[in-house]
Amino acid sequence: VRAAVNVDLTADGSFRRRPGYRLVKPGEYHSLWRNPVSGQVFVAEGAVLNVLSPDLSLTPVFELDSPEPTDFCEYNGNTYFRGGYYDGKRGRPLGVPTPSVTIEPVAGGLPQGRYGIALTAVNDAGEESGASRVQFVEGTGFRLHIQSNTPAVRAYITDGHGEQLRLAWEMPAGLLSYQITSPAAGDWLTSGGLEPLPKGQIIRGHGGRLYVAKGDMLCFSEPLRPHLWNPGYGFV
């Protein structure tokens, strides 16, 4: 044989016609990936990430920040990609957005003092955001004016002239204002200074953390909080 086109030579020396291919779904697709655990197949069309079904139908699950190719990884039952993850039911952004709040003093039952107040948001999966910037207000009670699109918001306050924040109340985010007039007695705040993990070119999970390569920097999440990182030290 001097020349052969579209022919494979097998181990026993015989010839076999090479399988062909055909167009089954036109479109500008990229970032095709199969989750090795769940078996789900993902493909992006422009900036829209889809789940590809066996019948080749597409189900949009997430809006990427650009039409650039994305990396994937499987970790803790989720499929992660640039800026988000898929939990088997829906796509979600990495990390819950921190709520914004304005505070005004009102008459209440707290001892007169200087109180620190910070808020976190909670999504429908029970995941908590990083805390808002601590604001200090003088008085005996406070009215919070909240802006958040999550199902719930948690308010943390210090003791009068204290520094440690404790949970005072969890309230529906649809409640645009709320008054705190009694001392906090809940859990201590543990998400101060944390932000959603940044987007990058490569994402991997290991040992209770997510790792994101962003340019020449490697960012890593807090342990057992894979969607939040501390920008003060969570990178190399």
Task: Name each region found by the language model.
Residues N50-V51:
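Short, surface-exposed beta-strand/strand-loop-strand elements in extracellular ectodomains
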Residues V1-Q40:
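N-terminal low-complexity, intrinsically disordered "leader/linker" segments enriched in small/polar
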Residues K25, D55-G208, V212-D216, F220-R225, ...:
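Disordered, low-complexity "stalk" and linker segments at domain junctions of extracellular
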Residues A44:
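Segments forming glycine/polar-rich beta-alpha architectures that bind adenosine-containing cofactors
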Residues S31, Q40-V41, D71, I202:
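Short, surface-exposed charged micro-motifs
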